[in-house]
Structures are given as structure tokens and as C-alpha cells.
Amino acid sequence: MGYPVIVEATRSPIGKRNGWLSGLHATELLGAVQKAVVDKAGIQSGLHAGDVEQVIGGCVTQFGEQSNNISRVAWLTAGLPEHVGATTVDCQCGSGQQANHLIAGLIAAGAIDVGIACGIEAMSRVGLGANAGPDRSLIRAQSWDIDLPNQFEAAERIAKRRGITREDVDVFGLESQRRAQRAWAEGRFDREISPIQAPVLDEQNQPTGERRLVFRDQGLRETTMAGLGELKPVLEGGIHTAGTSSQISDGAAAVLWMDEAVARAHGLTPRARIVAQALVGAEPYYHLDGPVQSTAKVLEKAGMKIGDIDIVEINEAFASVVLSWARVHEPDMDRVNVNGGAIALGHPVGCTGSRLITTALHELERTDQSLALITMCAGGALSTGTIIERI
């Protein structure tokens, strides 16, 4: 039996739709980050990519250039050792987080000693839902009679459930942008970012032959309450706008897991462990309210209360998702998404779970704290939850 620990974690910058990373093939983007996480760990230790036994990656839209087991294709595209196995999983927006649960589980079971959990979504190049085909009605049997709304309607139902107003979500959206701006100004993301070389595209999205080094998240916007108030709701009569919803984005992230004894034998310092993990089903009627349940589950498994948690990274799919969770669990909001979230930074869906774990780890280290909760809503009325502890 093994004892899984995180020894390295990194992510690409997040590019906005048709932005800085959109000229890069999805396999090149993920492969660059897979290689970066091993390189960063191996600089001091002599760890090599060939020491990795398995890679598990999350990807939501497994279609086109994200099909055919992208975790494996990306690994080979990056020139990494062919004997390393790879699997790609779809747990909707929780894919990248569930990949970490699975790799940690393999190590705990003694099946492997070294593994990478990662996530990718190049949403500029592979549109969300493209894998469903032209007739989305085929996804569900004719006998399906469950009220599972689309994500936009779900966000509005959650808002009504908790009495969340337009002003509430606008205030939250503004704060996400403010915190992200502060984080970048203070260099808080510098250690977790692996810069990416990407082709430059012209106005017709054609390569110019030039390349740029992308080292910063692109989605941050100058925002005011007045400006947010002028935005039109996505749904008529709704409260969510483009300023209070997650962005369509491109990005990848990777976390290197090892058995603790093996890590120490390589001269690597274990940085964090999983205290508790969960994947739960939530109420289909509300679809995206699952972080309420997954948080309760991991806190129960860990024997903790929300006040024991130092840092929370909860995905900002929509502002109401976070605000609903907060009204139930009553956290100190100064500990929640302290460096902004998907409203400001972006949400490359298959990547985000690994990105949140990466960000949470680095923020714990920056502030010399111990415990972080990472949670997300996911399509199909699912939610992932993880508590990690610094070692």
C-alpha cells in the first residue's frame, strides 16, 4: 500500500476564447504542461518522465483534436517516453479534479508509485458539446423524465432557491475581478505558471508564422458595478450576465503525485496529501448546486468543520453556485477564492479541477497555512470535493 503525496503542480496561463492560446493544438497545450510538471520536479532530484507510470487526464469535450485519449496523444506529442500509460476521463467539469482522485487512489492501492493527474480544454478549438453531435436529443432515452435543466437555467434556479439577487451576483463578479487583479499585481500566480509558446493568429484566426510566450492569464477585465449593471442577462428575466458567469477559455494543468517513500528516495519534498475526497451526485432539478453536498461529504469524512479550512477554491461556474454554497456552509469569505476565480480567470472545463488544486497548494505555501478545500459543480448533477493538507 502506498501513501500518495503531491510533489509538484503547475498550470498554463488561461487564454480567453480565440485568444493567446487558441493557435495551439490541444495536444500540444496539454503535452507542454505534462512535460513541465516533470521538468520542474526533476531539476533538483533527477526524476525523469520515464519514472512516471500512469497519466490520467480530464477532458470534457472528447471530440476532434481532444478525442482518441488526448492524455496519451499529448504525452507522445511532447516527446515523452512511450512506455508510460495514459487514460482520459470525463466527469464533466469535475474531470481534472477526479483525475487527481484516481491517481492518488492508484498510489494508495499500491498499483503505481508515480503518476500525473492533469486536465485540458481548448474551448476555442473544440466547442463545448461538440461531442454530442448535431442532435442533442439523442443523449437521453425517450423514457427520460428527469428535470435536469441546462447550465444557465440551473444557475437561475439556484439563485431563486437561496434568494440571491442581481446585486448579489454583480458584487461577487466584481470582487472576483478585483482579487484576480491583485493576485497578478502581487505575483501570486508566478510560481504555479508554466509559460507556453503559442502561435500568433491574425484576425481571421490564421497563423502569422510568429510565436509569443504566454505567461499571464488573459481573461481579466476592468470592471465596475455600473458596468456590470448595464450587461444584459443571459436568460430573459434572469440575473446572470457575462460578468457573473465563467468564461470560455483554453488551458491545461498537471499535478505530479508520488508515493511518499519513493518521493523522498528521489530527494523530493512531499508538499501535500489528500485528507478526504468525494464525487457525489446532486439534485438534478438544480443541476449545479452540488458543491453544497460534496463539501458536506468531505468535511464529514475528514472530521472537520468549515472553520477548520484555511483556503477554499470553489469553481465560479456562475456566481450563484458559490453564493448558494456560502449561504449553506457559512464560510469566512475572506478565505474563499482569495485570488479570484473562473469569472475573472476563465474556466477551461476539463482543466479547472487540476488548476484549482494547483492554485490551492501554492496559496497554502504562500501564506504558510495547512488546509485547503477544493470543490466544483459538474454537469449531470455531480460535484467533486477534495481536502488537501500541506506536509
Swiss-Prot record:
Effect of disrupting the coding gene: Cells lacking this gene display an attenuated disease phenotype with reduced colony-forming units in comparison to the wild-type. This mutant is unable to metabolize cholesterol to androst-4-ene-3,17-dione (AD) and androsta-1,4-diene-3,17-dione (ADD).
Domain of life: Bacteria
Keyword Signal in annotation: no
Coiled coil: none
Annotated CoA binding sites: Q151, R221, E222, T223, S246
Biological function: Involved in the beta-oxidation of the cholesterol side chain. It is important for utilization of cholesterol as a sole carbon source in vitro and for full virulence in the chronic stage of mouse lung infection. Catalyzes the thiolysis of 3,22-dioxochol-4-en-24-oyl-CoA to yield 3-oxo-4-pregnene-20-carboxyl-CoA (3-OPC-CoA) and acetyl-CoA. Also able to use acetoacetyl-CoA (AcAcCoA) as substrate.
Family statement: Belongs to the thiolase-like superfamily. Thiolase family.
Name of this protein: Steroid 3-ketoacyl-CoA thiolase
Organism: Mycobacterium tuberculosis (strain ATCC 25618 / H37Rv)
Gene label: fadA5
